[in-house]
């Protein structure tokens, strides 16, 4: 059970594990079995993919942007927007999703996705600059935004 708070809960987040039951990411200990944080900070805390469950009414309000000729926008862009609406509860040890990483998947083909979806990545990276508290990450996302602008310019030239 999650103890009450005055902030409205908009979703829950659980862990992923591989088919051999090894947890994806690093172990995070909590006396309560959960923490309340943002999707951006959760990425740094858990260091691995997570499985989100959002309230339907909030999820419907936050649509993924659509860019002609592109097929991808990082999901964290929307997860952050949902998190802006209320609290997200992250269960530190509860696994609800078993997974495997495929050779042709997003994690192993990041550069391909970035080059082919520069506007989708640009909206994500540019929004992350304001969300980050540490200068290192602000600079990282600023540079990634510039990289997206370069890829957009190269696509226009084709």
Pin down the residues of each PLM region:
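A short, conserved acidic/glycine-rich loop-to-beta-strand motif
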Residues: 2-16
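Secondary-structure boundary motif
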Residues: 2-5, 61, 84, 130
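Conserved nucleotide-sugar donor-binding catalytic segment
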Residues: 13-107
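C-terminal subregions of glycosyltransferases and related glycan-biosynthesis enzymes
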Residues: 76-80, 84, 89-158
């Amino acid at each position: 059970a999650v103890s009450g708070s005055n902030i409205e809960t908009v979703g829950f987040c659980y862990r992923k594990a591989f088919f051999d039951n090894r947890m994806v990411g690093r172990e995070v200990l909590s006396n309560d079995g959960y923490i309340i944080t943002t999707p951006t900070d959760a990425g740094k805390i858990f260091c691995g993919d997570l499985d989100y469950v959002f309230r339907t009414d909030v999820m419907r309000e936050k649509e993924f942007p659509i860019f002609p000729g592109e097929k991808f926008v990082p999901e964290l862009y929307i997860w952050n927007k949902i998190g802006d609406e209320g609290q997200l509860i992250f269960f530190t040890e509860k696994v609800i999703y078993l997974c495997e990483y495929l050779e042709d998947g997003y994690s192993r083909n990041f550069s391909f996705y970035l080059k082919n979806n520069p506007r989708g990545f640009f909206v994500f990276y540019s929004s992350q600059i304001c969300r980050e508290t540490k200068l290192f990450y602000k600079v990282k996302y600023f540079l990634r935004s510039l990289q997206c602008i370069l890829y957009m310019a190269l696509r226009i030239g084709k």
